Amino acid sequence: YHPHGDSSIYDTLVRLAQDFNVRYPLVDGQGNFGNIDGDSAAAYRYTEARMTHAAELLLDGLGENAVDFRANYAENDEEPVVLPAGFPNLLCNGATGIAVGMATSIPPHNAAEVIDAARFLIETPKATTADLMQFVKGPDFPTGGVIVESHESMLEAYETGRGGFRMRAKWEVEDTGRGTYQIIVTEIPYQVQKSRLLEKLGELLEQKKLPLLDDVRDESAEDVRLVLVPRAKTVEPDVLMESLFKSCDLETRFSMNMNVLHKGAPQVMGLKDVLLAYLEHRREVVVRRAEFRLDKIEKRLHLLDGYLIAYLNIDEVIRIIREEDEPKQVMIARFGITDIQAEAILNLRLRALRKLEEMEIRGEHTKLVEERDELVKLIGSTRRQWTTVSKQLKAARDQLTEDPALGDRRAAFEDAPDVDLAAALEASRPKEPLTVVLSAQGWIRGMKGHGLDPDSTKFKDGDELYLSEEVMSTDKIILMASDGRAFTLMADKLPGGRGHGEPIRLSIELEDSVDIVAMFKLEDERKRVMASTVGYGFIVTEKELESNRKAGKQAVNTGDGTLNVCMPVEGDMLAVVGSNRKMLIFPLDELPEMSRGKGNKLQAYRGKDTLAD
């Protein structure tokens, strides 16, 4: 690793101590280490830290030649290439990162489930991803919440290494008496800051974009407790929550891209491949630690053999030490021992040379020989190696699940309820009389009540009334532009009538050269005659004119002309009058009904003649 400043190192240490950020914290922090609201940790002179048991598991065996080491950035020290990893930290704690041309995003999982799947894979190497998902149900996020992704979608994600998981806040209904209730949010999605979530909800309430919600309060202490108050007791809790899930971070999506470094090269791996790579790594760690321990035992046995020779010839050893000028060489020649054994004998204290010491050394020798034999068998048997890996994983599982608060699954799984949100939102909107006013200069507003008096309506200097329409606040308004486009506005979303309103071009994308030629309340089954100045027209049902896009919908192809007729169908005959002062009358049923287009020729014109206004 290249050198980092103390600030980035401390920020990383803080994150590893936050149980709402890391599923299995690797740092045990003492002091203020931040919170889920996004508040910063205290400066490092005010905090203390130590490794957790999970971190110790990751490092277990590091000093026993379990992994390779390499020179560090400055080449003045060595660092491990990988850690021994007594538990599968990559899956349990997840990982996110970005590099040049690639990125990784791995969600955290429950250690007990992952370890159970790994041990099952040892016993059943041909197990499929579906088999492994009997143990690994899905991600397990530190902040809990509810995962509403289908099993099929998660299976595909774990097979390919790419996918995503929809996360929702966990909530419950609390009865407040007299038929009323409030919703309590107890868990929020992973990596969502509570303070920002509340800020967003407040903004949406102020902008009147949450018609089903009346108020939101934060009553959190150590645990999350957000109180959501419905606008009316008739609002169904499921409907209210579905509307909030679509509007803010009470629902988020965690994208999975299991792009990992395997044997030094990046590749996207599925769940089974990641587990197989981890298990092979653990088997290698077991073998290397066994070889390291075997080497230590051989060296110790070599010394013990020398000690035993000394005890069998204790009087001679003492004489040599007292009388000879070169006692080491004399002992080597006299007893046939090695230089190392002779040096060890010379380093013994004379007062330790007693019968009891001999018995202890013989006992130690016997135990080490037995351990050596077991290690030799382990190194020579793949089956024994896998058995050891499985036992070690079982021990790690027991250690990580000893505390239920850490070990138990936090994230739940549910199916998203089938809710007709559009109908519920429509039913919740208050129905009040409004008069929609459009001025000649293009300012629009919704004035309360019907029966508008044009003389009492105020406009900007030089402006005047152009179009008006009496509607209800739950209605939709259709605006027809001279270029043939149709726009839809919600009556209750229009600016109020106290001021002059706002320019219509803030609500719809209207070019400066284009004007509004008609404005009316949408009635789905009502029909209208549409005609352009070049003499073409057709009949359209108003429902076909509705559009949710700010750019509107191209309903009429006006050709070289403009739209100048948009009138409701009445009677059974149609009279067409041009600027040439000629009139043509024909049955209305001869005009085609279309959803969009140019229509039929209504009347032929020459030169500059057009359809009359």
Identify the residue ranges that each predicted region occupies:
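C-terminal interaction appendages of subunits in large macromolecular complexes
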Residues: 96, 102-613
